[in-house]
């Protein structure tokens, strides 16, 4: 649609020479993510060329706004687990040394997913836990149901520190 509009405008404004196709390139949000970026870029360019050729219009300079794709991998948030508590006699909660609401707001605001993993104690036995932030707000938690159906971390041991990390969150988050 945008390319057709470009072709119409190019005919009335011959100096028009650029097209901004916006954003939308996906970013890796889980470890087994596979996406053929090269294919998609080639497909975008070939479709623009095809439509311009069909309309007898020179191909434009193409601009993109792939913000998350461009900078997403540049960011990571590391937290330490400061406490573990049991709720409802069955739910284990690991509490981080910060707040998801202030440092990773998109995890609770729009259920954004990020690559998440333990930083240390990988050789330990793992357990299913919920992750909570330090605020008293009931929304300050990592929604495991939305993100991965379960969060597994090394079992907590008295006197042993545990660190976790969220990765590829360089766009639009606090870092």
Question: Model features per residue range: what roles?
Answer:
Residues 1, 36, 59:
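Conserved N-terminal phosphate-binding loop of PLP-dependent enzymes in the Aspartate aminotransferase
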Residues 4-8, 39-50:
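Alpha-helical scaffolding segments of alpha/beta enzyme cores, especially the outer helices
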Residues 1-18, 27, 52:
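Active-site-proximal beta-alpha core segment in soluble small-molecule metabolic enzymes
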Residues 29-38:
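Glycine-rich tight-turn/loop motif centered on a GG-T
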Residues 19-28, 64-69:
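Glycine-rich beta-strand-to-loop/alpha-helix junction loops that act as flexible
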Residues 43, 49, 53, 57-175:
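Charged (often Lys/Glu-rich) extended helix/loop segments that serve as interaction or gating elements
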Residues 17-24, 132-137:
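Short connector loops at secondary-structure junctions
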């Amino acid at each position: 649609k945008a390319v057709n509009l470009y072709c119409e405008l190019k005919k009335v404004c011959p100096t028009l020479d650029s097209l901004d196709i916006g954003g939308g390139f996906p970013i890796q949000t889980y470890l087994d993510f596979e996406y053929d970026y090269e294919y998609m870029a080639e497909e975008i360019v070939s479709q623009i060329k095809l439509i311009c050729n069909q309309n007898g219009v020179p191909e434009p300079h193409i601009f993109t706004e792939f913000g998350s794709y461009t900078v997403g991998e540049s960011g990571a948030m590391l937290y330490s687990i400061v406490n573990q508590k049991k709720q409802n006699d069955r739910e284990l909660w690991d509490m981080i040394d910060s707040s998801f609401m202030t440092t990773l707001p998109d995890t609770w605001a729009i259920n954004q997913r990020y690559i998440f993993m333990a930083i240390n104690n990988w050789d330990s036995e793992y357990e299913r836990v919920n992750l909570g932030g330090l605020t008293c707000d009931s929304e300050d938690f990592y929604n495991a149901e939305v993100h991965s159906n379960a969060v597994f971390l090394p079992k907590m041991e008295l006197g042993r520190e545990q660190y976790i990390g969220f990765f590829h969150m360089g766009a639009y988050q606090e870092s």
